[in-house]
């Protein structure tokens, strides 16, 4: 019994389709083009962990603009630049009409985590990158800007969770400094080795959950 051979053109078409599929999967994401579920919609549906205290501020057009993120490309780490202040005090400042600033999350001196802005909305923390980033502000005990152990642990935990729900990678975690050159978060800007250690701790935390 003879087997009918497929025309060579069929194999050429299949080969071309495989090449195109590979391009879609590997090249387009580098230009911010993704296939499948909307990453911002995934953030909107994410279940915030029980250890996060959700105190969402009201839409005021400034601190909370109420605008949807255009994309999610980075997680930005900040420090509050107000030594000794609590997460709650900084949250309450965001609510003040004169503040004009906010972040998605605040981490306090005892490791408490407060959510201020919904994950799928702009915060007012990272300048021109507000449109495609999630921001975390961390409290610190003194002018050096170094985070204490409780705050640091929560920062690693929160950042790892955000990477999980956003689909980002540890290399997508950046400092405010990396956007504007601002001395923020101060200790991680002035101590590059500590920043790299933090990224390693985040990567280890992500791996531990997989």
Q: Which positions does each model-derived feature cover?
A:
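Cell-envelope and extracellular/periplasmic
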Residues: 134-143
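Short coil-to-beta-strand
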Residues: 127-135
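Solvent-exposed, acidic/flexible segments
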Residues: 70, 98, 129, 144-152
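Conserved, mostly hydrophobic/aromatic
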Residues: 77, 136, 155
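Basic/polar, cationic surfaces and motifs that engage anionic cell-wall
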Residues: 2-17, 26-53, 142-210
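N-terminal catalytic cores of peptidoglycan-degrading enzymes
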Residues: 2-126
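Residues immediately flanking
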Residues: 79, 138, 177
């Amino acid at each position: 019994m003879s087997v009918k051979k497929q025309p060579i053109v069929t194999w050429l078409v299949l080969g071309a389709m495989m090449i195109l599929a590979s391009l879609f999967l590997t090249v387009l994401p580098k230009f911010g083009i993704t296939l499948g579920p909307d990453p911002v919609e995934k953030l909107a549906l994410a279940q915030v962990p029980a250890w996060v205290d959700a105190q969402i501020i009201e839409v005021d057009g400034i601190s909370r603009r109420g605008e949807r993120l255009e994309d999610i490309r980075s997680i930005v780490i900040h420090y509050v630049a107000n030594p000794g202040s609590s997460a709650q005090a900084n949250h309450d400042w965001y609510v003040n009409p004169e503040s004009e600033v906010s972040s998605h999350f605040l981490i306090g001196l005892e490791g408490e985590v407060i959510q201020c802005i919904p994950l799928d909305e702009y915060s007012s923390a990272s300048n021109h990158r507000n449109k495609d980033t999630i921001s975390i502000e961390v409290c610190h005990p003194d002018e050096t800007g170094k985070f204490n152990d409780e705050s640091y642990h929560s920062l690693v935990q929160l950042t790892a969770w955000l990477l999980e729900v956003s689909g980002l990678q540890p290399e997508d975690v950046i400092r405010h400094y990396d956007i504007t050159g601002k001395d923020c978060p101060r200790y991680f800007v002035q101590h590059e080795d500590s920043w790299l250690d933090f990224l390693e701790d985040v990567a280890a935390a992500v791996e531990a959950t997989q």
